[in-house]
Amino acid sequence: MNIFEELKARGLVFQTTDEEALVKALTEGQVSYYTGYDPTADSLHLGHLVAILTSRRLQLAGHKPYALVGGATGLIGDPSFKDAERILQTKETVLDWSQKIKEQLSCFLDFDNGENKAELVNNYDWFSQISFIDFLRDVGKHFTVNYMMSKDSVKKRIETGISYTEFAYQVMQGYDFYELNAKHNVTLQIGGSDQWGNMTAGTELLRKKADKTGHVMTVPLITDATGKKFGKSEGNAIWLDAKKTSPYEMYQFWLNVMDDDAVRFLKIFTFLSLDEIAAIEEQFNAARHERLAQKTLAREVVTLVHGEAAYQQALNITEQLFAGAIKNLSAAELKQGLSNVPNYQVQAEDSLNIVDMLVTAGISPSKRQAREDLQNGAIYLNGERLQNLDYSLSTADRIDNQLTVIRRGKKKYAVLTY
């Protein structure tokens, strides 16, 4: 199976400009290709991982990747399938985000070894050197307004309004392809399927300005079995930066994917062979309640993104919280595992009597209910049942002298911090 066949088998090929010519190029020699990442935030997220890992698969097959950070295009904003104009960031912010994205990409692509080692480029380097007049004369003249208006990404914004700034975005992205081809002989661009219009602007410019043929391959935008956009949990993006989304949160995200998605995601997001995935699928289908596919997915992706130690920690937090063994975890681990739990900052004037604290921290709605909860054995202090109505919290109840965990029943938690 050649690399293109494997990408197809994994569900990673959505659309290509000329499949036959692309397969020929990929099987007959080394292809230089690029994927672009606009710095629209200070971290990449799971949605970016599809293109990143596709790029890595091609590199492992002997092809040479260029990772383009859009220091210039990030200042403009891509209108593709956005309902409204993006808020423009300052140059300083975009340059800072560009640097952080570069660092993240180096975790996935090999920038150090072999003749096909990855290269990092930033389109700010060339756009900052070209004048507006030169850009209009040398690049803009190759694009008709009719051609630009025909793009779906533009059509969807015509009625609500699109600025000239965003309208010109596709020309800038097209010039990226031309520039990389001229300097590095890049002949293939990879991106999400929503980028098709912008990406083919590059092949059009190559054809008109240099009489060369470029290839485009898009990867699908991933949705779950219900059609919901992939990569978000409770409306929040799952970031690749551990400071924004902890390894534990990422582990839980993968652990909770639906059965109908789990095997498909193993093909897309892991480097397990297709034969290994087929074997996992067989075991998974025989005993879905054991969630083998989800557990494998969580292990593989968290290890890939954050490393083995972070995966082991996420697994340990999961197991200890499930067992209610709060004292087996450090304060740092509890902050990861209980990041979505209500947090109460204990004040100097607060009563430390357990009945009072249950009400103050929002665990019980009233003192009467708090007493009943204690008497009924529903209250747990750092994982241990507490029934003493006269108990007062002390420094001995603080894990790592930082926090105390109170639970009512099985699921209602509060974290007290000091």
UniProtKB/Swiss-Prot annotation:
Instruction: Please indicate the residue ranges that the annotation assigns to the motif 'KMSKS' region.
Output: 229-233
Q: Where is this protein localized, as stated in its record? A: Cytoplasm
Q: Name one GO cellular component term.
A: cytosol
Question: Known InterPro entries for this protein?
Answer: aa-tRNA-synth_I_CS (IPR001412), aa-tRNA-synth_Ic (IPR002305), Rossmann-like_a/b/a_fold (IPR014729), S4_RNA-bd_sf (IPR036986), SYY-like_C (IPR054608), Tyr-tRNA-ligase (IPR002307), Tyr-tRNA-ligase_bac-type (IPR024088), Tyr-tRNA-ligase_bac_1 (IPR024107)
According to the UniProt record, what class of enzyme is this? ligase
GO molecular function list: ATP binding; RNA binding; tyrosine-tRNA ligase activity
Q: Where on this chain does L-tyrosine bind?
A: 34, 169, 173
Q: Name one GO biological process term.
A: tyrosyl-tRNA aminoacylation
Major subcellular location class: cytoplasm
The catalytic activity of this protein is classed by the Enzyme Commission as 6.1.1.1
List the SUPFAM superfamilies hit by this protein, alphabetically.
Alpha-L RNA-binding motif (SSF55174), Nucleotidylyl transferase (SSF52374)
Functional summary from the UniProt entry: Catalyzes the attachment of tyrosine to tRNA(Tyr) in a two-step reaction: tyrosine is first activated by ATP to form Tyr-AMP and then transferred to the acceptor end of tRNA(Tyr).
What's the protein called, per UniProt?
Tyrosine--tRNA ligase
Q: Give the gene that encodes this protein.
A: tyrS
